[in-house]
Structures are given as structure tokens and as C-alpha cells.
């Protein structure tokens, strides 16, 4: 169908641009924030099409994005950059599971960066809670913090491994989950807990007295 460019929707413009690029049979394809100008519905539709395109592309594709979810869904390999420096690279799932540095953890969306001191190869002392945490990953000598993703916390009893006593500070509601900010008992440290409404369906969620994270979910981080 023939259309004047100005009459194309955002999604149609993106599809047209991709078609023009692919017509030249490139060996390298660079996509710089390809979905940033689209609304959420179009973004998901176009992203799905681009994912199918990349799966069949016989060449090298480079996606530049600030959206961690796009990178996770579309890229088998990723590189985390900050001010022109490579902070972490490797298989995408490995980078998310073990970002290694505080900056890389933040760029992959980790909300809980908790200061700590190293005790041994798999144990840290968590500042603010005055408790030890057990980690599955090796703790490097220069470890100054641990990263715990907000959805990796679960309610637990006082004696559970890696149990952290918490008190409620604030909460906010999303369509399908809750964001809760909790503090250490003395209020000197805080953490984010993201929990689905299927777990906490109350209109005014109250966090438990203790939250914990599995050793496999705790990431040792350096500066």
C-alpha cells in the first residue's frame, strides 16, 4: 500500500525503516533504541517482529538500548557500558545473574545494593542489619556490597537462612504487583520488595516481620 511517510504510524515507520535496511542485505545491523518512540502496545508488537527478524538474520546484529527487558529478551550476548568503559560482557543471563560491579548491577535494574563486608569465600556481613548472609557465588576480596533483586525476597521465619528483620516504610500499587519499601529495625538501611498481587492481594499490604533471599539470588559486587 502506497502511503505518504507523514501518514504512517510510529509502528509502520519502524517496519518501513527495517524493510529498507534489509533490502540492502547488510552484513551488520545496528539498532539504536529502535522502540523508544513507540507506545507500550506497539513496542511489544514491533519488538516481537524484530525478534523474529534477528533470529533469521545471517549476520551480526547490535542492539543499543537502555531497556534491560529488551536486552534480556532479544540478545543472547550483552555488554554493559558506562562512560565508554566496558563493565561486564558475556551471555545475557550470566550478566544478569552475576553483574559483578555496583554500576553494572544498577544498569541491569537491581534496586537493592546493600553495603557489606566480606567474611569468607561465601559469607558477607550485611551493614545495617548486623547479620551474615550466605552466597552461592564466590565473594571476591574487593566485595563492598551485595545486590538482591526486588522480586527475589520472600517472607520467612526468624530462624530461616539469610533472614532479615524488616519494618514497613511505604508501599505503591502497580496493576499486577506491589512495590514495598522496608527498613532495618533501626531505620538505618532500606530495601525494595516487589511482590505479585497473587501473593499479597490485600488493598493495604503489610510486609512480614522477616524477608530472606536464597544464596543463589545474592550477587557479590565491587566498586
Descriptions of predicted regions:
Residues 1, 5-103:
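ABC ATPase nucleotide-binding domains
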Residues 97-120, 147:
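C-terminal boundary and immediately downstream tail of ABC-type ATPase nucleotide-binding domains
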Amino acid at each position: 500500500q502506497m502511503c505518504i511517510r507523514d501518514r504512517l504510524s510510529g509502528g509502520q515507520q519502524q517496519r518501513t525503516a527495517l524493510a529498507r535496511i534489509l533490502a540492502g542485505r547488510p552484513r551488520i545491523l545496528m539498532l539504536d533504541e529502535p522502540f523508544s518512540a513507540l507506545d507500550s502496545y506497539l513496542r511489544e508488537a514491533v519488538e516481537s517482529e524484530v525478534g523474529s527478524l534477528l533470529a533469521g538474520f545471517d549476520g551480526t546484529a547490535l542492539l543499543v538500548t537502555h531497556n534491560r527487558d529488551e536486552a534480556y529478551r532479544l540478545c543472547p550476548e550483552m555488554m554493559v557500558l558506562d562512560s565508554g568503559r566496558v563493565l561486564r560482557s558475556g551471555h545475557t543471563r550470566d550478566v544478569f545473574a552475576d553483574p559483578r560491579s555496583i554500576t553494572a548491577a544498577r544498569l541491569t535494574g537491581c534496586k537493592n545494593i546493600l553495603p557489606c563486608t566480606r567474611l569468607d569465600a561465601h559469607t558477607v556481613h550485611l551493614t545495617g542489619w548486623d547479620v551474615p548472609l550466605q552466597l552461592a557465588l564466590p565473594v571476591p576480596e574487593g566485595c563492598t556490597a551485595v545486590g538482591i533483586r526486588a522480586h527475589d525476597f520472600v517472607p520467612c521465619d526468624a530462624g530461616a537462612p539469610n533472614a532479615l528483620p524488616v519494618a514497613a516504610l511505604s508501599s505503591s500499587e502497580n496493576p499486577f504487583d506491589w512495590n514495598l519499601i522496608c527498613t532495618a529495625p533501626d531505620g538505618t538501611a532500606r530495601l525494595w520488595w516487589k511482590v505479585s498481587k497473587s501473593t499479597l492481594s490485600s488493598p493495604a499490604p503489610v510486609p512480614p516481620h522477616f524477608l530472606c533471599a536464597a544464596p543463589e539470588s545474592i550477587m557479590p559486587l565491587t566498586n
